[in-house]
Swiss-Prot record:
Positions that bind S-adenosyl-L-methionine: 160-161, 190, 219-221, 295
Enzyme class: transferase
Species for this entry: Prochlorococcus marinus (strain MIT 9515)
Name used for this protein in its record: Probable dual-specificity RNA methyltransferase RlmN
Gene Ontology biological process terms from the UniProt entry: rRNA base methylation; tRNA methylation
Family per record: Belongs to the radical SAM superfamily. RlmN family.
Lineage: Bacteria, Bacillati, Cyanobacteriota, Cyanophyceae, Synechococcales
Amino acid sequence: MKNLLGCSVKDLENVALNYGQAAFRGRQIYSWLYNYKNRSKSIDEINVLPLNFRNQLKKEGFIFGELILKEKYLANDGTLKLLLNTRDNESVECVGIPTEKRLTACLSSQVGCPMDCKFCATGKEGLKRSLKASEILDQILFIENEMNQKVTNIVFMGMGEPLLNIDELLFSIRSINEDFDVSQRRITVSTVAIPNMIRKLSEMSFQVLGKCQFTLAISLHASNQKTRETIIPSAKNYHIKYIIDDCREFVKKTGRRVSFEYLMLHGVNDKLEHADELSNLIKGFQCHVNLIQYNQIEEVEFKQTPSKNAQLFQNRLSNNGINVSLRKSRGSDRNAACGQLRQNAKIK
């Protein structure tokens, strides 16, 4: 199979030329593939193309995406979780999060995850494989088609560790920006932090994309190394001090602030002394803290921080001069919230 999803307009012009067609036929394919209001789901539906050209493309194995919708779950707040099957019969999940003026797509970069964070459902069954860029982009098509709305924002916060699939990640970002017409500034890449990869991400972004304007979000979740190691096993390989050093360098290179994701776990990392410790750790450079209320999952005994305590924690950070917000959880009643995505439909 030759997936056209992810092809640039120039790529598709070349496809047309290779089959004896005029270049504008490639531009027609491009429009029918990426234009939300004029999108087709298969080559057969592009009726502006000559029939013989459509038949040639199908005979040569060209397709418009390769994921298959298996299940969908609509939460009370309008959040939609989709369970998609790959051609090798693996499963991946993505989430559409609507608000009044935008639609955020939460995308997966891998089938499963190797990081085994103790508070997250995704890593419970380990990593199966990384996704191809076309499989990442296909998630956007499904969200737009199912929600009948154009995606305006992208967060790589679904299944998997994006920086362990960096080539396909950056190819996806290029297409999201240029083909799906979503500004890099509306794209967020979330990582638990992999040694040497934060620096590599900024370097490769300039090489592949020509710029680095997306938001880097670090899944920090602790104010010190000891606590972080207890909830994120991979933290043993990358000291929290060096993560912050690399983030400072990222800001210098890109001019973009770094976001720190901080999942509040009652009795683990949510005391005011942790807020002070976190403030001292990250002060002095352009950053923002996203406090996240824990979403309960099976097999895990962590408890959600009471709202009153979370507000006190937020106030302490703010009083310490840290830009901070308390993120409202979406879709938790359908296991579509942060930390609840997994490879199968066992939990519904």
